[in-house]
């Protein structure tokens, strides 16, 4: 029985069908528009195996988002530097993901904690079609070091299972997408546990789905590799709140992967 390879198939799609486009960074891309991947979180945890994905960085970044933080110092203290290229001299990034998730400003000077409201509403009214969190705050985009690439996500409850769909407006398919898939799969598992639900699907939807011109050789190397089965994720503790998880609460089991493939980041 062959191993499903939705992510690798997406890479092949971009390489075969992508249109060459210029971009903000000046690097150049091959790009397609409007793609979707699905992952069954009840079966496994979608950590890509054709190269190593650094799970610690995935988890630390997600916990940082949930803190509502805008400064890279907390991540640096955990040994994670993935946002350093965009931070200013003081480590500030402006009102990026976590700020919007936890402290979306209102016209009267208040703030909305979208994650707290999400958890409350999922518990009280699981069949609602409004279980949505947005990081795309048009009025604050100019103040962000980097406008949100993964901009908008929605949860869905059916038959005791929690599913999540992410809309990613800009998808760096080689470097970013494996990370984003793992991050939102992890978030879905965490939210499901807090609500006493089983994990359902994670659905990834991409807008401008691209491979940078300086990643083409790396993609070719990755696609030459045979995939392994996805690992399992164990969550070792159920804290009192979605905001109380720590890195030690997560254990990835049976993660068999090919070596890391390094590539430059387009800043």
Swiss-Prot record:
GO molecular function of the protein, one example?
thymidylate synthase activity
Q: Listed GO cellular component terms?
A: cytosol
- PROSITE patterns attached to this UniProt entry: THYMIDYLATE_SYNTHASE
In what pathway does it function?
Answer: Pyrimidine metabolism; dTTP biosynthesis
Q: What is its main location?
A: cytoplasm
| Gene3D superfamilies reported in the protein's UniProt record | Thymidylate synthase/dCMP hydroxymethylase domain
Give the UniProt subcellular location, in the record's own words.
Answer: Cytoplasm
What residues form the catalytic site here? Answer: 149
The reactions it catalyses are: dUMP + (6R)-5,10-methylene-5,6,7,8-tetrahydrofolate = 7,8-dihydrofolate + dTMP
Q: What is its EC number?
A: 2.1.1.45
Q: Which domain of life is it from?
A: Bacteria
This protein's UniProt keywords: Cytoplasm, Methyltransferase, Nucleotide biosynthesis, Transferase
Q: Where does dUMP bind?
A: 24, 129-130, 169-172, 180, 210-212
Q: Which residues bind (6R)-5,10-methylene-5,6,7,8-tetrahydrofolate?
A: 54, 172, 266
- Is Lyase among the key words of this record? no
Complexes and interactors: Homodimer.
> Which NCBIfam families does this chain map to?
PRK01827.1-3, PRK01827.1-5, thym_sym
Instruction: State what protein this is by name.
Output: Thymidylate synthase
The gene that this protein is the product of is: thyA
């Amino acid at each position: 029985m062959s191993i499903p390879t939705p992510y690798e198939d997406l890479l092949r799609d971009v390489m075969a069908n992508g249109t060459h486009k210029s971009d903000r960074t000046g690097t150049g891309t091959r790009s397609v528009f409007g793609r979707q991947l699905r992952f069954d979180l009840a079966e496994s945890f979608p950590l890509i195996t054709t190269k190593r994905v650094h799970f610690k960085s995935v988890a630390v970044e997600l916990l940082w988002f949930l803190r509502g933080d805008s400064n890279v110092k907390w991540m640096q203290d955990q040994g994670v530097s993935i946002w350093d290229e965009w931070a200013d001299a003081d480590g500030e990034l402006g009102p990026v993901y976590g700020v919007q998730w936890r402290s979306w400003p209102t016209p009267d000077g208040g703030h909305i904690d979208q994650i707290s409201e999400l958890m409350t509403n999922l518990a009280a009214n699981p069949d609602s079609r409004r279980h949505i969190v947005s990081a795309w705050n048009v009025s604050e985009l100019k103040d962000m070091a980097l406008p949100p690439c993964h901009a908008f996500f929605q949860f869905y409850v059916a038959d005791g299972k929690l599913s999540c769909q992410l809309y990613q407006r800009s998808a760096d398919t080689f470097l970013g997408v494996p990370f984003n898939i793992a991050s939102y799969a992890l978030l879905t598992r965490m939210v499901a546990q807090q609500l006493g639900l089983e994990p359902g699907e994670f659905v990834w939807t991409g807008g401008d789905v691209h491979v940078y011109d300086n990643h083409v050789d790396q993609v070719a190397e990755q696609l030459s590799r045979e995939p392994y089965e996805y690992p399992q994720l164990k969550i070792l503790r159920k804290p009192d709140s979605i905001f109380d998880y720590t890195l030690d609460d997560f254990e990835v089991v049976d993660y068999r992967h090919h070596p890391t493939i390094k590539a430059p980041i387009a800043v």
